[in-house]
Amino acid sequence: MVLLSKFDFFGNKAGEVELPDAFFAQEGSGLQLVKDYLVAIRANKRQWSACTRNRSEVSHSTKKPFRQKGTGNARQGCLAAPQFRGGGIVFGPKPKFDQHVRINKKEKRAAIRLLLSQKIQTNHLIVADDSVFTNSLTSPKTKEALRFLKSCNVECRGVLFIDDLEHAQNNESLRLSLRNLPAVRGFTYGMNINGYDLVSARNIVISEKALNRLSGHLISAMKD
């Protein structure tokens, strides 16, 4: 078992959270899996709708622009040739086939587990008590949210907040308080986590309930 400290809204230690050893990956393992997962995320965000017209598709007459000989110019066949303005494109992009990259659920969950374990091992993940997300603020106050980050010694740069979906009705004050901080990259929920968000974020603040539920979900996927 690995013990992680959890903090309250004032930066004081409020207990510990246990994570099984199976959650953590060995150093250097799974790098190719993570790379494939991130490439799939980036590729599937593209529209793949880029399309150009070649010389047979552009609207031009097939008449020769000038006679073959006697003008001193290089011979030309028609204005649809790619060297002319408005002519066709050579080797341009075409939506030839579905370029959606598939990755199965087991690979996705394994990649997310590897990324989370890396954040924990490099001390870039802070576990917050559930009260931080639900009962810490009665109204949105950006100043108080910033004070919480500083009290937990969180580097104010690229911070991602992760909460449990069951707290969605009670964490609005904190979400609105964080919205005006440039250092906060986003606010999401554990079961909706995206591996690209984990890579892009420098630091992660996660609620105890979200971490327990997410870790249990990811570990159970290893046994399937």
From Swiss-Prot:
Summarizing the function annotation, the protein's role is: One of the primary rRNA binding proteins, this protein initially binds near the 5'-end of the 23S rRNA. It is important during the early stages of 50S assembly. It makes multiple contacts with different domains of the 23S rRNA in the assembled 50S subunit and ribosome.
Q: What is this protein called?
A: Large ribosomal subunit protein uL4
PANTHER family from the UniProt entry:
50S RIBOSOMAL PROTEIN L4, LARGE RIBOSOMAL SUBUNIT PROTEIN UL4M
Region span, Disordered: 54-73
TM ranges are none
Q: Which UniProt keywords apply?
A: Ribonucleoprotein, Ribosomal protein, RNA-binding, rRNA-binding
For this chain, one GO molecular function annotation is: rRNA binding
Q: How does it assemble?
A: Part of the 50S ribosomal subunit.
The record ties this protein, via InterPro entries, to: Ribosomal_uL4, Ribosomal_uL4-like, Ribosomal_uL4_dom_sf
Q: Name one Pfam family in it.
A: Ribosomal_L4
> GO cellular component annotations, sorted alphabetically?
ribonucleoprotein complex; ribosome
Q: Which family does it belong to?
A: Belongs to the universal ribosomal protein uL4 family.
Question: Any one Gene Ontology biological process term?
Answer: translation
